[in-house]
């Protein structure tokens, strides 16, 4: 077994950040060979640099690889790396500005769509009731006319529809969505025709007074519902952006590895050595 890994020092972390700013993420061998950083990072391998940079990126954004977390607010720090973190990850501010509820940071990993948006989509498909299904634009227009939604709702609506389709709650036919045939369509109960009863005017006035007295509470409840909807939308949007950033980071790392292998093959061929390439399973991005 090799020697145990030593804990990263603040000097090494700062050198890694400056190296990424100078050469870019994924250029680990280039950073190691740079005379400006090689004396400090001499005890670290390119794998160490890659893993440490990923940890720094996630900690700077306040997000993990699979969950959207609410960053904890702490006292001001005099660390010189705070400005570099803000420079490297400007998109993290968009997440921390969102006032998330206590349970908004729980990403539905089990494929469940939040009840509010799921109910909106099911209502839209039920009301539109197209035999061949409705497209995303038609569903969005219907929901926007009946509900107060966040400005980015149209952007993450396709992911909501895919989750519902994966859980067999709705069906996807080409680019259209519809309710499954097993969905029980609700029909209003038959209304009995009878002579209208004369209502008591005093009871009607009491009802009107009750709603008038409770109007501030209703307004507060509506405002709270709008804020919760906005927070949920921002949480899902932030998670999608984080997953895309992680995917791009993996692609950059794989590209760096391929370039390194190509350079080694070129060096061997230049020396007249015979190099044999063994095919491996293709990795999906």
Curated annotation (Swiss-Prot):
Residue span, H15 domain: 113-181
Presence of keyword Amino-acid biosynthesis: no
InterPro entries: Histone_H1/H5_H15 (IPR005818), Homeodomain-like_sf (IPR009057), Myb_dom (IPR017930), SANT/Myb (IPR001005), SMH1-6 (IPR044597), WH-like_DNA-bd_sf (IPR036388), WH_DNA-bd_sf (IPR036390)
Database matches in SMART domains: H15 (SM00526), SANT (SM00717)
Any single Gene Ontology cellular-component annotation: chromatin
Coiled-coil regions listed: 226-255
Stretches for region Disordered: 1-35
Job of this protein: Binds preferentially double-stranded telomeric repeats, but may also bind to the single telomeric strand.
Domain-level remarks: HTH myb-type domain confers double-stranded telomeric DNA-binding while the H15 domain is involved in non-specific DNA-protein interaction and multimerization.
Name listed for the protein in its UniProt record: Single myb histone 3
Organism: Zea mays
